[in-house]
């Protein structure tokens, strides 16, 4: 069962502060994938296209973080790419079709993991038998069903399952690792070189060799080997392609960097506009050739994001604007947002630093006045210099706790309490001097 929009938003709330509109848009889009698959009429189901999303907002407000967290929530093929990495066909760089190829690779890996999980108990039993054959070699080369249940074998089996034999060394025959052949791909020819690499790897994939290792390590290797024998690679390919076509999600970051500004004319803009034109068929729906077969992009959900500081969404070519119908604006962060970022997420910065210092035996605590002062400092520096959003908190926290981090080993058993006075003492001079703040914070 896929999560409801409310559950998705609640899960995102654990990691991202504010930006409710963006969370709701993403949650609805994710749920609509499931709703579409539940429609019984195949003709109608095929006609329902995903509504692609464009997230607009300054840097450091949570656009990329929403994508990261969404990847964990979406039990579907998901890939995040930077728009700046791609160039128009004919220019040096990657072409946009490689997005779908990478997404398919991701789906193959995902489906293989699912398939291996289903057969893990059978693989475990087969690996166990192979190890017991080494520990108790059969007299005539093969074991009869009766011999598999002898008392000695059962004793060893019990010890093996309880981990008593984990450190024992054994010699076992395992598949030889294919020789890794690294081929440097010329721009735009990654697909051909990856096929060459896989061809060379398959040449030596059926060889075996005897290796000496601990029982624990042998168990892990043999479990993977046995699981690989039990799964059907053709089924995995078919399921992966279907999963990409019906449930795939592509997150395109930094879209504003390939927008052509209306008031500038430069040679680089030709390639930028070319990337937008190349993205059009992909976003609207086309068929891309991959090493696993043809993949249709008609029902893949595209989520794009950009700061749009210099360029505006209207600077994108009209056809691409039309293919991103849902627009969501993310707001700049306030002092209150910074306070919440430092305290509310399940892995907040204050918790992270406290946990790091705890490994040295030093107790690091933060009170409300200290947290609010850190938030105020970060907000002030953002206002006076470049606004880099929540990323400013990393810089401020590193600077604030630099001495503590350096001397933590010598202060084991002590407690460092971060309050307003502590923040002012360690950052006061930097805050007062704007030039220093510009370069250090």
UniProtKB/Swiss-Prot annotation:
Broad class of the protein's primary localization: cytoplasm
UniProt keyword terms in alphabetical order: ATP-binding, Chaperone, Cytoplasm, Nucleotide-binding
Chaperone among keywords: yes
GO biological process, one term: proteolysis involved in protein catabolic process
Matches recorded under SUPFAM superfamilies: P-loop containing nucleoside triphosphate hydrolases
Cellular component GO terms held in the UniProt record: HslUV protease complex
One Gene Ontology molecular-function label: ATP binding
Protein location: Cytoplasm
Residues binding ATP, per UniProt: 17, 60-65, 253, 319, 391
Top-rank taxon, per record: Bacteria
InterPro entries: AAA+_ATPase, ATP-dep_Clp_protease_ClpX, ATPase_AAA_core, Clp_ATPase_C, HslU, P-loop_NTPase
Subunit: A double ring-shaped homohexamer of HslV is capped on each side by a ring-shaped HslU homohexamer. The assembly of the HslU/HslV complex is dependent on binding of ATP.
Its job: ATPase subunit of a proteasome-like degradation complex; this subunit has chaperone activity. The binding of ATP and its subsequent hydrolysis by HslU are essential for unfolding of protein substrates subsequently hydrolyzed by HslV. HslU recognizes the N-terminal part of its protein substrates and unfolds these before they are guided to HslV for hydrolysis.
Family per record: Belongs to the ClpX chaperone family. HslU subfamily.
UniProt protein name: ATP-dependent protease ATPase subunit HslU
Source organism of the structure: Legionella pneumophila subsp. pneumophila (strain Philadelphia 1 / ATCC 33152 / DSM 7513)
Primary gene name: hslU
């Amino acid at each position: 069962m896929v999560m409801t929009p409310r559950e998705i938003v609640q899960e995102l709330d654990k990691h991202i502060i504010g930006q409710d509109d963006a969370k709701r848009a993403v949650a609805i889009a994710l749920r609509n994938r499931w709703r579409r698959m539940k429609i019984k009429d195949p003709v109608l189901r095929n006609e329902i296209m995903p509504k692609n999303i464009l997230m607009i907002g300054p840097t450091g407000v949570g656009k990329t973080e929403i994508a990261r967290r969404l990847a964990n929530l979406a039990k579907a093929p998901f890939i995040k790419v930077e728009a700046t990495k791609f160039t128009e066909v004919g220019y040096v760089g990657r072409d946009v079709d490689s997005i779908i190829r990478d997404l398919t690779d991701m789906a193959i890996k995902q489906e293989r993991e699912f398939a291996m999980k289903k057969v893990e108990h059978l693989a475990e039993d087969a690996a166990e038998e192979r190890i017991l054959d080494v520990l108790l070699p059969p007299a005539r080369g093969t074991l009869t069903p009766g011999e598999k249940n002898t008392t000695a074998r059962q004793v060893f089996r019990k010890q093996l399952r309880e981990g008593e034999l984990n450190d024992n060394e054994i010699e076992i025959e395992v598949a030889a690792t294919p020789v890794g052949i690294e081929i440097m791909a010329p721009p735009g020819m990654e697909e051909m070189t990856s096929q060459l690499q896989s061809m060379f790897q398959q040449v030596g994939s059926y060889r075996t060799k005897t290796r000496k290792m601990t029982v624990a390590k042998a168990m892990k290797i043999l479990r993977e080997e046995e699981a690989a024998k039990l799964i059907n690679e053709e089924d995995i390919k078919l399921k992966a392609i279907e999963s990409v076509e019906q449930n795939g999600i592509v997150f395109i970051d930094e879209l504003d960097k390939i927008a052509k500004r209306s008031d500038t004319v430069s040679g680089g803009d030709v390639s930028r506009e070319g990337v937008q034109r190349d993205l059009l068929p992909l976003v609207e729906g086309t068929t891309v050739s991959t090493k696993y077969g043809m993949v249709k992009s008609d029902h893949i959900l595209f989520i794009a994001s950009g700061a749009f500081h210099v360029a505006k969404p209207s600077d994108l070519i009209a056809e691409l604007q039309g293919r991103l119908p849902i627009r969501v604006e993310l707001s700049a962060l306030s002092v209150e947002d910074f306070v919440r970022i430092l305290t509310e997420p399940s892995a907040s910065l204050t918790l992270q630093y406290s946990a790091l210092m705890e490994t040295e035996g030093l107790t690091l605590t933060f009170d409300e006045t200290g947290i609010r002062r850190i938030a105020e400092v970060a907000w002030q520096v953002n206002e006076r210099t470049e606004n880099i959003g929540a990323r400013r908190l990393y810089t401020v926290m590193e600077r604030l706790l630099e001495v503590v981090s350096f001397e933590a080993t010598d202060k084991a058993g002590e407690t460092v309490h971060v309050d307003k006075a502590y923040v002012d003492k360690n950052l006061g001079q930097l805050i007062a001097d704007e030039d220093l703040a510009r370069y250090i914070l």
